[in-house]
Regions:
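Portal/gating segments that form or line small-molecule/metal binding sites
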Residues: 32
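A Rossmann-like FAD-binding core segment of flavoenzymes
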Residues: 2-21, 26-29, 90-168
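Glycine-rich dinucleotide-binding loop and its adjacent helix/turn
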Residues: 38-91
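Residue-level detector of short coil/turn "hinge" positions at structural boundaries
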Residues: 1-2, 40
């Protein structure tokens, strides 16, 4: 059987295992598969939270097709960000990859794919300052980490790709 319920306790000292659920129910099982999942890690900006589902996404494969023919921005510098940026080139007319450092942390193979893709522009040494818009995202303000200068990108889509937090 499969239960979609929060398990709050497990007693592994006896068989069958005893599980306690948040609802107060208890279960027994001969074996257990823990599939806790993970959630996208967010930047923590108020404007980011305001626009989740309205142009801000933590899942390029889920939401990329909404931005067919449009310019989008991916925030991050690791493998997840590189993979998201490359995936988004299937839909977007241009993909800006924004990273706070002067080099990406992604693997060499992914970095080479990014550098040779004409749809990708990497913006180094910038951090998101504010995501702007009214009902939906219209752009993102990026701050240069060395000079403090602010640059604006007009875009309806901002993908946050800075990792995931395990749901444990």
């Amino acid at each position: 059987a499969v239960f979609n319920e929060e398990i709050t306790s497990v007693d592994f000292t006896q068989r069958p295992f005893r599980l306690g659920a948040g609802s107060g129910k208890s279960y027994t099982a001969g074996s257990i598969i823990a599939a806790t999942g993970a959630q996208a890690r967010w930047l923590g900006m108020p404007s980011e939270q305001k626009f989740i589902g309205k142009g801000v996404s933590g899942c390029a494969t889920c939401d990329g097709f909404f931005f067919r023919g449009k310019e989008v921005c991916v925030v991050g510098g690791g493998d997840s960000a590189a993979e998201d940026a490359l995936f988004l080139t299937k839909f977007a007319s241009r993909v800006y990859l924004v990273h706070r450092r002067d080099a990406l942390r992604a693997t060499f193979r992914l970095v080479e794919k990014l550098r040779t893709n004409p749809k990708v522009e990497i913006i180094f040494e910038h951090t998101p300052e504010e995501i702007t818009g009214e009902a939906k995202v219209t752009g993102i303000n990026l701050k240069n980490v060395k000079t403090g200068a602010v640059r604006r990108l007009e875009t309806p889509g901002v993908f946050i790709a800075i990792g995931h937090t395990p749901a444990t």
